[in-house]
Amino acid sequence: MKKLSNIFENHNNINITFGEEIQIEDKEAVMLPVIVNGVEMSTDDIKFSITPEYLDNKFYYRPDIFIKKELRGKGLGYNIYKAFIHEFGNVISPDAFRDNNVEIPKIYNRLAKEPDIVVERKPGGYYAYLKSQR
């Protein structure tokens, strides 16, 4: 078993995938297993769930993320959001549901620098989606 410190040796080379194939269809939150550099993370370390939302005649995915204090500052939140957008197409962070008004805007500011991702700050929250879904 790899030690957590070994998984995060290179902050610039973090590969995020999600566990088994997930169907996100209902309004219920779905917990996604997060795999970092080939190691499935314990839910004590990272919890990532998605709730589908129907807004403006489109489906969006609202993430809820928890990262253990010792693992913060390594780019995990950003990389998890980016991987999710590449796999599922979009995320939203409504102001009403956001618990962290410091880190979440930082994630969206970094996502806005990705050439294939569009980030919009609309009344009510942040939206991020693949340019190909415009």
Task: Please annotate each region the language model reported.
Residues 32, 38, 44, 79, ...:
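Preference for well-ordered, secondary-structure-rich cores of eukaryotic proteins
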